[in-house]
């Protein structure tokens, strides 16, 4: 079998005006998420695997027994488990005019997220989701020419129809050939490290601390205080493999192997782009394949934005301790995090307030690369226990979200009984 040494020029995919208009028509329409994530139930093992996939060894998440002695009375999941664990919701078929456009062949990446958490996910919980488009914005991007910005709402709830979290994911779609022609990042070089450089990184790892069982009370927090320093990196292909092992990255495109990959190519052919050997491979490999990343105008493979979201969440949960509650986190992915890059995460308290029974701490944090570039600025709000009650308050979702979750779970059960 001959193996070609070069690949054909990738097929050019551009936006269709009718797809853009269709997306605009669907803003505010909720739909059941009928495609499962890699895992469907938050078992002790899936919770542990997800936490470890981004480097988190918090016993609240990785030890099935540790949480029994805490206010949660059991093992709970780390904040972003929803990106790897969700069952398919059974739902009535959507009319063609209400189906979201696929934008096949168009490159997509996550530019930022805003997430609010309402209650813990426990071992044994099954998660479901519904969502919809919050807005549609067409613009000229400095990186890729014509681009489409789509904030997507994702509401996650459990088997009791209780809203667990609401997440708005800012996705950006770009035309691949335009990205290549602009070549904005051509001067960026891959990071290299001396033994001394690596020793400095290891010093930060060795000094990291987790608050754990030592309760951090709201009264003891001072505006201006630092949350400390965490390091992540240098980023390796191994990191991407391990992150996938936690469950992320398999929906909606379902990268797979063997006969399953053949079947997937029949389903979404434009998602497969020939590699240097002439073999169709997933466009998702931009996250681990330098050659493919360079072919679309990027200096090299880069991470998923959701990985850095997990890093930021790791930083916050380490600081707040077992008794705290991460109420909200909002991030922006302003620059790519390339293979070999190292990030230090820092943050400080910028405010304190009381809302009802919630004792809240507002935080600004960010991830800064070895180029001294802030690639992922973020804000967060943490609910901490006060000394009088001893408990961190949890927020309540809106009645509308509760109603939609109950309706969708009811229909899911009805269709399953047929």
Predicted feature residues:
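Hydrophobic beta-sheet segments that form the core/acyl-binding groove
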Residues: 111-160, 167, 224, 324-370
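Short regulatory "switch" loops immediately downstream of catalytic or recognition motifs
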Residues: 136-139, 251-255, 352, 385-386
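A structural microfeature
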Residues: 164-167, 228, 376
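Flexible glycine-rich active-site/ligand-binding loops centered on an Asp-His dyad
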Residues: 147-157, 167-188, 381-386
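Charge-rich, low-complexity intrinsically disordered segments
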Residues: 348-353, 365-383, 392-397
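A short acidic/small-residue loop/turn micro-motif
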Residues: 135, 171-173, 234-235, 351-352, ...
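Residues in well-ordered beta-strands of folded domains
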Residues: 84, 116, 170-172, 230, ...
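Hot-dog-fold acyl-thioester-processing enzymes
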Residues: 2-112, 178-323, 387-418
């Amino acid at each position: 079998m001959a193996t070609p040494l070069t690949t054909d020029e990738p097929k050019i995919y551009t936006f269709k005006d009718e797809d853009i208009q269709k997306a605009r028509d669907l803003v505010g329409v909720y739909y059941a998420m009928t495609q499962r994530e890699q895992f469907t139930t938050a078992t002790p093992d899936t919770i542990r695997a997800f936490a470890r996939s981004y480097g988190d060894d918090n016993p609240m998440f990785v030890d099935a027994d540790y949480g029994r002695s805490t206010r949660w009375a059991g093992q709970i999941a780390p904040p972003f488990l929803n990106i790897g664990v969700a069952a398919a919701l059974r739902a009535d078929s959507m009319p063609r005019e209400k189906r979201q456009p696929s934008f096949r062949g168009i490159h997509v990446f996550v530019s930022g997220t805003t997430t609010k958490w309402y209650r813990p996910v426990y071992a044994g919980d099954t998660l479901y989701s519904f969502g919809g488009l919050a807005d549609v914005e067409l613009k000229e991007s400095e990186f890729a020419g014509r681009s489409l910005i789509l904030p997507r709402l994702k509401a996650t709830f459990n088997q009791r129809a209780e809203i667990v979290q609401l997440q708005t994911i800012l996705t950006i779609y770009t035309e691949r050939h335009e990205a290549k022609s602009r070549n904005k990042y051509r001067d960026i070089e891959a990071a290299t490290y001396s033994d001394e450089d690596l020793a400095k990184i290891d010093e930060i790892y060795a000094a990291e601390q987790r608050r754990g069982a030592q309760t951090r009370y709201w009264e003891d927090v001072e505006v201006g205080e630092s949350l400390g320093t965490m390091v992540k990196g240098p980023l390796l292909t191994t990191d991407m493999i391990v992150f996938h092992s936690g469950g992320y990255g398999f929906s909606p495109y379902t990268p797979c192997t063997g006969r399953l990959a053949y079947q997937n190519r029949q389903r979404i052919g434009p998602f497969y782009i020939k590699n240097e050997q002439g073999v169709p491979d997933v466009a998702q490999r931009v996250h681990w394949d330098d050659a493919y990343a360079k072919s679309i105008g990027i200096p090299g493979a880069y991470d998923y934005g959701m990985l850095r979201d997990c890093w930021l969440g790791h930083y916050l949960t380490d600081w707040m301790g077992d008794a705290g509650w991460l109420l909200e986190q909002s991030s922006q992915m302003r620059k790519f995090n390339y293979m070999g890059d190292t990030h230090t995460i820092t943050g400080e308290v910028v405010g304190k307030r009381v809302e009802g029974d919630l004792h809240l701490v507002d935080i600004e944090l960010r991830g800064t690369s070895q180029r001294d570039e802030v690639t992922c600025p973020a804000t967060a709000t943490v609910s901490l226990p006060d000394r009088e009650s001893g408990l961190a308050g949890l927020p309540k979702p809106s009645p509308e979200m509760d109603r939609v979750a109950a309706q969708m779970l009811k229909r899911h059960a009805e269709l399953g009984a047929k």
